[in-house]
Amino acid sequence: MSKRFRRLSHSIYECKYHLVFCPKYRYPIFEGEIKAYTEREIEKLISQKEGLEIIELNIQSDHVHLVMWIAPKYSVSQVMGYLKGKLALRRLSRYERLGKQYWGRHLWGRGYCVSTIGIDETRIREYVRWQEKKQKEIEQLQGKLFDETE
């Protein structure tokens, strides 16, 4: 099997996503130790869940870019809830000064951006067309084989 795909017990998949999320009010809080700590925590949290894998991680001063594999057993919203929830609890308890900026213990903005990564639309459409042609060729060959055996 190609390295391009991942495997679960009953499926193979290639589910890669580009996720972007920001702290509430888009404050530039990811600098110095907080940035390094956040990067370590994201890597640790992702490694704790089977079926999640970081491809790229880039933390800017006011947002996080994350490219990752997400197994089909998880929804993107589950993964984002897990990440944002755990990161908020850990960072607010470690960095008390953030609690003053983010009252109510709400560290993250409500939303996030997600886009899928994979084969472009043109290649997918070509593949689908090719599959139909190949299926017809297979059916014709099977028909010839069936006719010869009678």
What are these language model-derived features?
Residues 1-150:
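Basic nucleic-acid-binding interfaces
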